[in-house]
């Protein structure tokens, strides 16, 4: 993956393709790196079952019960939609191509988990369709569970948690939070709710400052918009400057939307491998993806791999099949 300059890992999709397209267009105009656009689908509470569509006349109670039971069994299969893929032909990416960049979009799923749903969610086949997995956690017990076996999670987000800092219990568990950071799980702060009224703004700053404090100066944190409309997006340098209000130096603040964001994307990509050691890609496509810690593109990586005799032999055998 090429080095990115600025990335917003939380541009929300609310079911309106035109609105999502407008959000991405604005992000592009504001200067976010062309390589990264993350479209987020937030499904709320994973374990919550919506049975509104099961209401029937009183004389069909048995049928209601049957449908309710079927819904409870299959709810985790139907609650997760397919990722939303933006039609790139509707975007003007000519400037990026002239600068030697390529447009890439990533899908993201955000969900609220609890102790009873984490196992089902981890093994839900539809989850694997998404590039980035972000979760909201209600308490430190679940956070500790993710620290031990959370290799399927990329982000723990404060997005959607509209509470005072005193009500987010895990924000006072520095050792647990730091242990999550040590295993590669990042924490996300979203600034859009700070633009939606004084109470939301107070909640945003209190939670953000506490998270900055317990992560020792923003280590393992990204800053995203969480925007579902263009007016809530801010330019990269404005977002970087915002971090100074948390008590961070300016350059450290900019890492929250650049270097740290890229680390999240690299972790997400290695989730498609076996412990990050083996990567499977389709070489029949025009742009096969080969992960690189040095920032080289796939063509350079393939040329280097082709210098290895064993690799060339394997490729020759595959071409003969």
How would you name each of these model-derived features?
Residues 1-37, 43-91, 128, 143-321:
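Charged catalytic cores and adjacent phosphate/nucleic-acid-binding surfaces used
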Residues 36, 110-113, 132-137, 156:
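Short, hydrophobic beta-strand segments that form beta-sheet elements in well-ordered domains
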Residues 82-127:
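N-terminal active-site wall of soluble small-molecule enzyme domains
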Residues 118-125, 136-137, 147-150, 169:
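NAD-dependent ADP-ribosyltransferases
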Residues 138-142:
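Short, polar loop motifs at secondary-structure junctions
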């Amino acid at each position: 993956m090429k080095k990115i300059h600025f990335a917003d890992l939380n541009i929300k999709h609310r079911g309106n393709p035109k609105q999502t397209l407008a959000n991405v267009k604005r992000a592009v105009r504001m200067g976010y790196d062309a390589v990264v656009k993350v479209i987020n689908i937030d499904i709320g509470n994973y374990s919550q079952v919506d049975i509104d569509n099961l209401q029937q006349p009183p004389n069909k109670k048995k049928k209601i019960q049957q449908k309710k039971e079927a819904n409870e069994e299959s709810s985790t299969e139907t609650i997760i939609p397919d990722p939303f893929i933006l039609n790139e032909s509707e975007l003007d990416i000519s400037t990026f191509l002239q600068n030697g960049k390529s447009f890439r979009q990533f899908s993201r799923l955000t969900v609220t988990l609890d102790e009873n749903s984490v196992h089902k969610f981890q093994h839900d086949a539809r989850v694997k369709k998404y590039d980035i997995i972000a979760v909201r956690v209600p308490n430190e017990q679940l956070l500790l569970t993710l620290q031990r076996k959370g290799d399927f999670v990329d982000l723990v987000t404060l997005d959607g948690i509209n509470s005072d800092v005193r009500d987010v219990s895990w924000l006072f568990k520095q050792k647990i939070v730091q242990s999550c950071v040590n295993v590669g799980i990042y924490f996300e702060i979203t600034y859009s709710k700070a633009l939606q009224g004084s109470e939301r703004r107070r909640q945003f700053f209190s939670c953000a400052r506490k998270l900055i404090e317990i992560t020792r100066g923003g280590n393992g944190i990204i800053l995203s918009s969480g925007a579902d409309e263009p007016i809530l997006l801010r330019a990269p340098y404005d977002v970087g400057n915002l971090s100074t209000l948390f008590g961070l130096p300016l350059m450290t603040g900019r890492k929250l939307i650049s270097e740290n964001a890229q680390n999240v994307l690299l972790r997400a990509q290695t989730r498609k491998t076996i412990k990050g050691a083996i990567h499977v890609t389709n070489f029949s496509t025009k742009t096969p993806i080969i992960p690189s810690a040095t920032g080289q593109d796939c063509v350079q990586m393939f040329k280097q791999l082709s210098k290895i005799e064993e690799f060339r032999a394997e490729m020759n055998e595959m071409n003969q099949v």
